[in-house]
Amino acid sequence: MPKVSIVLPSFNGERYIRESIESVVNQTFTDWELIIVDDCSTDGTLHIAEEYARKEERIKVIHNQENQKLPEALNIGFRHASGRYLTWTSDDNMYLSRALEEMVRYLDKHKEVPMVCTGMLFMDENMQYMKEFISYNSVQMRVQDTVGACFMYRREVLADVGEYSREFFCVEDYEYWIRILIKYHSIGYLPYNFYLYRRQKNSLTIEKADRIRRMNSLLHCRYFDWCIAGIRDNPEYILFLYNQLLADNWIDEVKRNCFEEIMPALKAEKALDDKKAVVIYGAGQNGERAYECLKEQVLAFVDTNPLKAGGQKCGLPVWTLEELKKYYDNNRHQVLISVRAELQLEIIDSLMEMGIPQYAVFARIS
């Protein structure tokens, strides 16, 4: 019985799957089994997988007669896994040679930890370095997946938290990590890069990006109490979650009351009034997108960047804060904050100090 089971699901992955398989075969740790799940590919994926299985007895191949999509393909693979430790990888990514060895060593040493993840590097299609993945952050996990693609967990985890959810296709891994954190309260982290994550051009279509965004919102709505409990003292993450759920209409009265209790300044965040002119706070890309949505209702922009303030955006003036204070009329105007969530807190505070009683955030119209 192998110590580690690796599941490799693939659908039409013939272009890079050899590199992915070779990265497993070339591991310094050798007590593994690789279970390749061909998810009804129409290219040469199955042929390549079977070629490797004939040469290497540690490799098994499962062929799905119908396409099951990633969550169920993973579940099928793990139902055939016999290892003490479990992991999975993708057909276009690669382990560095010591990845399995180091993760096994960590789990062997830290018996209390259910799972470990490591750093990884983003690469382009030709495996040229692009950038380093953000480090695992247990607090940030409440609003964003920071586990990455190199990880390993104990077989008991599968028994305790169950299989991957088909409902959360596209964010099935993040949802699984949340269940692990709810059950065990921690995930171990090795601050070394043991994985190469290939970012292919045009691989993230508009439709897929939109689904990921919607699934993340649904995920945070489903686990709202857990998410909010871990970020009550972090206003930037509170605003991130608020904006995300607001954009997808997931904020009901209960959630709004919760947000306002934690951050009273959100009581002033209101829907836009069609009868009032809009001043867009933020003359960047989000500000331009806001203008495209509102057009004739927009009076001006506001920005603290000296390179933008005093100029024009979309044919309208870009005010300084002093000009906003001078020209703003509560009866005729309203402010739409159109910057990233992590920049909103300072703006909200400045509006309150200026006596502007309410505002809206861009998520309301995005």
Question: What function would you assign to each model-found segment?
Answer:
Residues 2-5, 33, 175:
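Cell-envelope/extracellular polymer assembly enzymes that use nucleotide-activated donors
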Residues 22-31:
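Short, acidic, metal-binding catalytic loop of nucleotide-sugar glycosyltransferases
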Residues 30, 38-47, 66, 90:
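A conserved acidic beta->alpha catalytic loop
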Residues 64-81:
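Glycine-rich, basic loop-to-helix element that forms the pyrophosphate-binding segment
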Residues 79, 135-226, 232-238:
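Conserved nucleotide-sugar donor-binding catalytic segment
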Residues 86:
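Short aromatic/hydrophobic "clamp" motif used to bind/position activated sugar donors
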Residues 98-130:
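Conserved donor NDP-sugar-binding/catalytic core segment of glycosyltransferases
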Residues 231-366:
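Hydrophobic, well-ordered beta-alpha structural blocks that scaffold small-molecule cofactor pockets
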